Curated annotation (Swiss-Prot):
The gene is NTM. It is found in: Cell membrane. A lipid is attached at N321 (GPI-anchor amidated asparagine). It is a lipid-anchor; GPI-anchor. Residues 39-126, 136-218, 222-309 form the Ig-like C2-type domain. This is Neurotrimin. It comes from the Eukaryota. Residues 322-344 form a propeptide.
Length: 344
């Protein structure tokens, strides 16, 4: 309902009918603009929702009566207001100009407005079209989503506005990779862990600043041990074995030696777990502690393991792809003693 959708005062009903006859603007009859040098209304008027629209009509001293109409309903006739909408006010009524203002414009105000005048000869009309622009607004967007690696996802971002806004999707974290879609819908087939992170939906139509919303996409995948560190430690010293694993959800770690799980606090051993890292700490290394240890990382999607060596001084540990193995030992002191015995 536009500015014309308000009731008229009952005592003016007869005058309304008279004015319609006077100005010859019956409902449904098209009105042409520019049939004469006057009245001359503005070209199309474009305003943003919430702003004020001024409708001006240029006239001259030959005019005896003048009115502004919204479609076929009179808003103002001369100085008299026929519309009860408080947003419609008279700005000027002079020999050269007849203007009204519609305040706090809304989308239902959009449409044709007619300036109608009466001269000594016959009525004349001129029309202007009011265009209402609306800032973009995102009315529907997908919720944050958690999905297993390899599955397909579809993200939705619905926006309204006048003109119709352009919607774009962009992957912004963990690192920006530019625009990935210029559509309301973003389809990702066989999603990978690298495609996790925040996705930004932007709606713009040049009426106001773009509107931005974000969706967080979490990609779940089984653990992958990216680093497994063995170490050489003398007897009686502190030693640490490290196992680092990438996983979503975060991996849970367990340590084993000779197929037996190591329990924290037993035999001077401590297990220190963080979301992506586990440490097996020996406070006082003994000969019995040397050997091969297994780090197991697991989450709800799977598990993996790596072999890590704790060795003594002089031993060489070869580490590859999260596993370590003993390559050999060279004990320098026994060789030196043997050399001295043979010499003498």
């Amino acid at each position: 309902m536009g500015v014309c959708g308000y009731l008229f005062l009952p005592w003016k009903c007869l005058v309304v009918v008279s004015l319609r006859l006077l100005f010859l603007v019956p409902t449904g009859v098209p009105v042409r603009s520019g049939d004469a040098t006057f009245p001359k209304a503005m070209d199309n008027v474009t305003v943003r929702q919430g702003e004020s629209a001024t409708l001006r009509c240029t006239i001259d001293n030959r005019v005896t009566r003048v009115a502004w109409l919204n479609r076929s309903t009179i808003l103002y006739a001369g100085n008299d207001k026929w519309c009860l909408d408080p947003r419609v006010v008279l700005l000027s009524n002079t020999q050269t100009q007849y203007s009204i203002e519609i305040q706090n414009v809304d989308v239902y105000d959009e449409g044709p407005y007619t300036c109608s005048v009466q001269t000594d000869n016959h009525p004349k009309t001129s029309r202007v079209h009011l265009i209402v622009q609306v800032s973009p607004k995102i009315v529907e967007i997908s919720s944050d989503i958690s999905i297993n690696e390899g599955n397909n996802i579809s993200l939705t971002c619905i926006a309204t506005g006048r003109p119709e806004p352009t919607v774009t999707w962009r992957h912004i974290s963990p690192k920006a990779v530019g625009f990935v879609s210029e559509d309301e819908y973003l389809e990702i087939q066989g999603i990978t862990r690298e495609q996790s992170g925040d996705y930004e939906c932007s709606a713009s139509n040049d009426v106001a600043a773009p509107v931005v919303r974000r969706v967080k996409v979490t990609v779940n995948y089984p653990p992958y041990i990216s680093e497994a560190k063995g170490t050489g430690v003398p007897v009686g010293q502190k030693g640490t074995l490290q196992c680092e694993a990438s996983a979503v959800p975060s991996a849970e770690f367990q340590w084993y030696k000779d197929d037996k799980r190591l329990i924290e606090g037993k035999k001077g051993v401590k297990v220190e777990n963080r979301p992506f890292l586990s440490k097996l700490i020996f406070f006082n290394v003994s000969e019995h502690d040397y050997g091969n240890y297994t780090c197991v990382a697991s989450n709800k999607l799977g598990h993996t393991n790596a072999s890590i060596m704790l060795f003594g001084p002089g031993a060489v540990s070869e580490v590859s792809n999260g596993t370590s193995r003993r390559a050999g030992c060279v004990w320098l002191l026994p060789l030196l003693v043997l050399h001295l015995l043979l010499k003498f």
